[in-house]
Swiss-Prot record:
Binding of ATP, residues: N195, L196, S197, E198
InterPro entries in alphabetical order: Bifunc_HldE (IPR023030), Carboh/pur_kinase_PfkB_CS (IPR002173), Cyt_trans-like (IPR004821), PfkB_dom (IPR011611), RfaE_dom_I (IPR011913), RfaE_dom_II (IPR011914), Ribokinase-like (IPR029056), Rossmann-like_a/b/a_fold (IPR014729)
Coiled coil residues, start to end: none
Record bears the keyword Nucleotidyltransferase: yes
Catalytic residues identified in the record: D264
Oligomer status and interactors: Homodimer.
EC id: 2.7.1.167, 2.7.7.70
The protein's name in its UniProt record: Bifunctional protein HldE
Keywords: ATP-binding, Carbohydrate metabolism, Kinase, Multifunctional enzyme, Nucleotide-binding, Nucleotidyltransferase, Transferase
The keyword Phosphoprotein belongs to this UniProt entry's keyword annotation: no
Reactions catalysed: D-glycero-beta-D-manno-heptose 7-phosphate + ATP = D-glycero-beta-D-manno-heptose 1,7-bisphosphate + ADP + H(+); D-glycero-beta-D-manno-heptose 1-phosphate + ATP + H(+) = ADP-D-glycero-beta-D-manno-heptose + diphosphate
GO cellular component, as recorded: cytosol
SUPFAM superfamilies for this protein: Nucleotidylyl transferase, Ribokinase-like
Gene that this sequence comes from: hldE
Length: 476
């Protein structure tokens, strides 16, 4: 399936559900408490992250879509922290404050990458009047292209049937990430997105794919669903619709570090794509690609449009790797049209080592795209002597282009890349070492164009010269 990423900026999505704040306390532990046989943790770092339905809303906003979040909170520090975090990532919060209840908060204490304890602060909102939530949905429906109901069984969706009916009456697709085995309450939804465990809790264990499809199609009919998307971890996803052949999407994950929040990413990307005008099949394809990205990250995370584009089309198809100057100018112009920040650096990069990789990764973090300009073989000889380079230009560029941090690699013949930098005019020019910014080739041109120049440190003790010397001395 060939899918083009939509303009997510024209998509409006409302997320309604159980919002919560995830708190993390990190610190070392080296002794046992004299008060009880428990470890003492010296808390050094505190992190706060939006969780539950709030994480779905963040995934939608990370794509550049208009993301609005409705949920129930208390009137407390947790609610204020949640709102502040979400505002930072352009999620519009429209919470219903309940003074008699605390904001749902999960506090985790960790030491040496091990979770020691989790403390939950919650009472549930099942007895809270749902009318304010229904009113907010009704008000938002004319401005949105999709409604997401994120159910964590904490009470925000106690009147889920009323919410479904409001959306269907307005002809707005309603997508639900279900909880529990009572799927009757989701009757009439446009799409349910259970994982395999949640699906089999309702229909029973499926011995093979054929049985999964058969039972899934029966579930679609029984609950009058328009579609069912079963997420199946390493087996990808299966989309089932009445009267249409099943669509099986194999996983695109290269590595799996953490599946936390992957379901939030799936439904968030799916809803944003639908709201932006993609078909359901195309939206599922994009959601599957996004899931492959997010499980390769540690902790609850989101996916950017750039990461999604790379996952869908591949680095070669999206104009990555080694380029001529003319090709680079075109790629940079397209990046700027997308609002991306272009970073540029340069060097010989003769024998690539850990210091280079770390430096390039840090440079890439400063923007959306990274250009690496590489000295030609002749230029390297003039600067380093007749014995250099060890590796020919073509090989150096191939290795650099294979790095995840590097988007574009371009050669230059001169001793410095000043002419090339003046042609490209990156938003940020980066150089490693102990340079003064004003001494960096191209800095004057970049500043004159309104850009910036930054110096990054190299890791001590790592250099191509030292590696070559070690090899000559027989220490390689």
């Amino acid at each position: 399936m060939k899918v083009t990423l939509p303009d997510f900026r024209r998509a409006g999505v409302l997320v309604v559900g159980d919002v919560m704040l995830d708190r993390y306390w990190y610190g070392p532990t080296s002794r046992i408490s004299p008060e009880a046989p428990v470890p003492v943790v010296k808390v050094e770092t505190i992190e706060e992250r939006p969780g539950g339905a709030a994480n779905v809303a963040m995934n939608i906003a990370s794509l550049g879509a208009n993301s609005r979040l409705v949920g129930l909170t208390g009137i407390d520090d947790a609610a204020r922290a949640l709102s502040a975090k979400l505002n930072e990532v352009n999620v519009r919060c429209d919470f219903v404050s309940v003074p008699t209840h605390p904001t749902i908060t999960k506090l985790r204490v960790l030491s040496r990458n091990q979770q020691l304890i989790r403390l939950d602060f919650e009472e549930g909102f099942s007895n809270v009047d749902p009318q304010p939530l229904l009113e907010r949905i009704q008000q938002a429906l004319p401005q949105i292209g999709a409604l997401v109901l994120s159910d964590y069984a904490k009470g925000a969706l106690s009147q889920v049937q009323s919410m479904i009916q409001l959306a269907r009456a307005a002809k707005v697709p309603v997508l639900i990430d279900p909880k529990g085995s009572d799927f009757e309450r989701y009757r009439g939804a446009t799409l349910l997105t259970p994982n395999l465990s949640e699906f089999e809790a309702v229909v029973g264990h499926c011995k093979d794919e054929a049985e999964l499809v058969e039972r899934g199609m029966k579930l679609v009919a029984d609950f009058e669903l328009s579609a069912l998307l079963v997420t199946r971890s390493e087996h990808g996803m299966t989309l089932l619709q009445p009267g249409i052949a099943p669509l099986h999407l194999p996983t695109l994950a290269q590595e799996v570090f953490d599946v936390t929040g992957a379901g939030d990413t799936v439904i968030g990307v799916l809803a944003a794509a639908l709201a932006a005008g993609n078909t359901l099949e195309e939206s599922c394809f994009l959601a599957n690609a996004a899931a492959g990205v997010v499980v390769g990250k540690l902790g609850t995370s989101t996916v950017s449009p750039i990461e999604l584009e790379n996952a869908v089309r591949g680095r070669a198809e999206t104009g990555f790797g080694v380029m001529t100057e003319a090709q680079l100018k075109t790629a940079v112009a397209q990046a700027r049209q997308r609002g991306e920040k272009v970073v540029m650096t340069n060097g010989i990069f003769d024998i690539l080592h850990a210091g280079h990789v770390s430096y390039l990764a840090n440079a890439r973090k400063l923007g959306d795209r990274l250009i690496v300009a590489v000295n030609s073989d002749a230029s390297t000889k003039r600067l380093k002597g007749e014995t250099r380079p060890v590796n020919a230009l073509e090989n150096r560029m191939i290795v650099l282009g294979a790095l995840e941090a590097v988007d574009w690699v371009v050669p230059f013949e001169e001793d410095t890349p000043q002419r090339l930098i003046a042609d490209i005019l990156p938003d940020l020019l980066v150089k490693g070492g102990d340079y003064k910014p004003e001494d960096i080739a191209g800095s004057t041109e970049v500043w004159a164009n309104g850009g910036d120049v930054k110096v990054l440190n190299f890791e001590d003790g790592l250099s191509t010269t030292n590696i070559i010397k070690a090899i000559k001395d027989g220490r390689g």
